A protein has these predicted regions:
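A short, conserved, highly charged catalytic patch centered on acidic carboxylates
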Residues: 1-114, 121-150
Length: 150
C-alpha cells in the first residue's frame, strides 16, 4: 500500500488571519512567521532528508528546570530513540548564542544525536559527541541520523 502524499503549504483565511494546514499534526494552525519556518523545515526533513512523517513530533513537550517547554520538532528513530531536536525561529530572528543556549537546554533533556537550529535562511546543525556538540557542514539524512557515525 502506497502512502498518501502529504499536503504541504495549504493555507486559508479564517477569522481575519491566515491559517496553514500542518500535515504532521493534521490540523490547521496560525501562519505566524515562526510557523512558516517550522513548516518549511518539516517539509525539508520529510521530503528531502527522508525522515518518515510518523517519526516527527511537532511542538514536543518537555520540562527544562521544572518549567514546561516545547521543542519545535523532535525526530525519532525506529525504536523511539530521539535522533534530532529542531528549533525554529522567524526569518527576522538572528540565530544568536541565546537561541543556541535555548536549543542546548532542550538537547540536554531529550539527548538526541543531533541539534538543528534554523530561521529558514540559515541552518546550523550539530552532532552530539560525548558532552560536546560538533558543528556539521551539512544536514544529515534520516539514514545518516540512524547510524552512529557520520
Amino acid at each position: 500500500m502506497e502512502a498518501t502524499p502529504l499536503s504541504w503549504f495549504k493555507t486559508e483565511p479564517r477569522e481575519g488571519r491566515t491559517m496553514v494546514f500542518d500535515p504532521l499534526r493534521r490540523r490547521w494552525v496560525a501562519l505566524t512567521p515562526e510557523e512558516e519556518v517550522r513548516q518549511k523545515t518539516l517539509y525539508l526533513l520529510v521530503e528531502h532528508l527522508g525522515v518518515p512523517a510518523g517519526r516527527v513530533a511537532v511542538e514536543y513537550s518537555l520540562k527544562v528546570n521544572g518549567q514546561d517547554k516545547r521543542a519545535d520538532a523532535v525526530v525519532f528513530g525506529g525504536a523511539g530513540e530521539p535522533l534530532m531536536v529542531v528549533e525554529c525561529k522567524a526569518a527576522t530572528v538572528a540565530l544568536t548564542d541565546v537561541v543556541l543556549d535555548q536549543a542546548v537546554r532542550y538537547h540536554s533533556v531529550i539527548q538526541p544525536r543531533y541539534l538543528l537550529l534554523t530561521n529558514g535562511t540559515t541552518f546550523y546543525c550539530y552532532k552530539a559527541e560525548g558532552q560536546s556538540l560538533q558543528p556539521l557542514d551539512h544536514l544529515p539524512t534520516y539514514a545518516e541520523m540512524m547510524t552512529t557515525d557520520l
